Amino acid sequence: MSNAAQKRAARKARAAWTSCLDTHAQQEEWTQIFSTIDPIDFMLPEERKRLDELPNEFMVYRGYQGYRRVGLCWALSLEAANISANLDQTLPRGKVVACRVTKADVYALVLNNGLQIIILPKTFRSKYKSIYQAVR
């Protein structure tokens, strides 16, 4: 695939990701897609800049309900994770887990609806599964 075609594929994947209401249900498919796309092409210039500005090691938070504790989407702020933890009003109140990560663990940073979301690939999940810390 040519460089231009790779960039187009990344932009289409990004459009699908940012419009998807439930990325959790297709984690395996998204992981497969991300393995074929350069994150530089997936992120917008402002997102790449924001990711570059982060320290090498930082905290991320995941808000979840029910069985969705392990996932691809993490927030940079506890407030954003709290929102994610309670999106579905038909489910019991959710929880938030926190994890310290390095930039090398991050696939991409996406500014979606004003929330900074970190997308972490499947390798991250297996690497950090045993050190999740409940924060509430």
Which residue stretches match the model-derived regions?
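Conserved NAD+-utilizing ADP-ribose enzyme module
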Residues: M1-F58, G63-L72, L76-R136
